[in-house]
Amino acid sequence: MSAGNLLEALTDNLVDKTKCIFWGKCAETCILDNIRINRAPCSAACPLGLNIQGYVQLVARGKDDEARAVIAQDLPFAQLICRICDHPCEHACNRCKIDGQAVNINGIKRYLFAGEKMLPLECAEASGKTVAVIGAGPAGLLAAHDLRKAGHAVSVYEAEGKAGGLLRNILPVWKLPDAVLDEVVGIMEQAGVVFHYGQRIVDQKALDDLSQRYDAVVLALGAGGGRKASIEGEELPGVLSAFRFLMEVRAGGCQKLSGHVVVVGGGYVALD
């Protein structure tokens, strides 16, 4: 008997499949490797490895609070992510092979969290360490969240007047309202994260100064910038960068367009 067949046989003998609800928790502790290795395709496709089959099964059983708890174990800011997630899990969903349509996984996540108040951030005992995070965009916010959760004292330095980075400066308000970002920042401030706005770290001297004042410095600088197509004519008058155009729209200072407009591309930026 091959190793794979032996593991399958052990599973058949040790797991009561009539009682299994496939919620994925067993895979974290089970001694049988094939349960851990053969993860649900949706979970394997998720960048954070969320226990997707777990919270979907709990929702199906009317256990919404338990489903939220399962997601919250691995996903901070679920109220925010559920509005903008690219949901690669749905592309990997087994239902696509059966009837051509995935389970609406992100829709379920949004059902669970949209409109729900964010829970306070629970922090570990104070470590005595201090950390400066430069940048309050998506990377900086997540870094500050995880560091504060671990018990470190965190200060965030942001060049703009508010936190959020591209989430606030480019995404349309119908997709991600400012109030959601404000709630994220508010929860972090309640947990003790200190935000310093209008603080642009522009040279080595400023960085060295922070390094002297804090035990560690996290660089979460903006990576924003429009991509060029490298085709002839893209620098001509009337050809606009989607990145710059969306920023102007978000700021309320967009130039007025008239006549026919061609949008090159078919992704989320093009749709926005």
State where each predicted segment sits:
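Ferredoxin-type iron-sulfur electron-transfer modules and their immediate structural context
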Residues: 1-130, 217-237
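Residue-level detector of alpha-helix initiation sites
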Residues: 25, 76, 137-138, 162, ...
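N-terminal Rossmann-like dinucleotide/flavin-binding domain of flavoprotein oxidoreductases
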Residues: 68-78, 86-88, 166-215
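Rossmann-like dinucleotide/flavin-binding elements
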Residues: 130-157, 197-208, 225-227, 244-272
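Glycine-rich FAD pyrophosphate-binding loop
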Residues: 152-168
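Conserved beta-strand segments of alpha/beta enzyme cores
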Residues: 153, 192-194, 238
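Redox-cofactor binding/interface segments in oxidoreductases and associated redox assembly factors
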Residues: 219-220, 241, 263
